[in-house]
């Protein structure tokens, strides 16, 4: 599977991705895998800063949009403007979210679940797909 993304120089071949990502990062970011619930580094982490794409470093989420949904994965109620693409799964049951810059698989977004957030959305994100940068 060829990587997708824009023309900002963040597109790479699978061989290039394998050289810069861990096997688990490649499985999730490039092959659209999912980490086991409750196992991710950022599931219960609430530091002040920004979450970036683990593949290309693009900022994706502010820490102020992270909340505890109890789903077993990091949850955010919105991404940074233009940072995340949404693609309905072929079965129409879920909407996949990917990094707009490199096409890396982040997880899925769910709407209308009743969470008391400004958007009533839950971006259910694999910890392996993101990297936290603390506020300075």
From Swiss-Prot:
Keyword NADP included in the entry's annotation: no
One family name in Pfam for this protein: SelR
Required co-factors: Zn(2+)
GO cellular component labels: cytoplasm; cytosol
Active site: 124
Cofactor detail note: Binds 1 zinc ion per subunit.
Molecular-function GO term, any one: peptide-methionine (R)-S-oxide reductase activity
Disulphide bridges: 71-124
Top-level taxonomic group: Eukaryota
Compartment list: Cytoplasm, Cytosol
Residues involved in Zn(2+) binding: 53, 56, 99, 102
Residues of the MsrB domain: 14-135
EC number: 1.8.4.12
Catalytic activity line of the entry: L-methionyl-[protein] + [thioredoxin]-disulfide + H2O = L-methionyl-(R)-S-oxide-[protein] + [thioredoxin]-dithiol
Keyword list, A-Z: Cytoplasm, Disulfide bond, Electron transport, Metal-binding, Oxidoreductase, Redox-active center, Transport, Zinc
GO BP annotations, alphabetical order: cellular response to oxidative stress; protein repair
Function: Catalyzes the reduction of methionine sulfoxide (MetSO) to methionine in proteins. Plays a protective role against oxidative stress by restoring activity to proteins that have been inactivated by methionine oxidation. MSRB family specifically reduces the MetSO R-enantiomer.
Family: Belongs to the MsrB Met sulfoxide reductase family.
Protein name in UniProt: Peptide methionine sulfoxide reductase B5
Organism: Oryza sativa subsp. japonica
């Amino acid at each position: 599977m060829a990587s997708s993304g824009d023309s900002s120089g963040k597109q790479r071949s699978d061989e290039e991705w394998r050289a810069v990502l861990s096997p688990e990062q490649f499985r999730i970011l490039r092959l659209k895998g999912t980490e086991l619930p409750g196992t991710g580094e950022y599931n219960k982490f609430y530091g002040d800063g920004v979450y970036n794409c683990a593949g290309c470093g693009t900022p994706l989420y502010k820490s102020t949009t992270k909340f505890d949904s109890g789903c077993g994965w990091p949850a955010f109620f919105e991404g940074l403007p233009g940072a995340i693409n949404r693609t309905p799964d072929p079965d129409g049951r879920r909407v996949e979210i990917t990094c707009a810059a490199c096409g890396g698989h982040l997880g899925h977004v769910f709407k209308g679940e009743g969470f008391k957030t400004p958007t009533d959305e839950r971006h259910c994100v694999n910890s392996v797909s993101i990297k936290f940068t603390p506020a300075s």
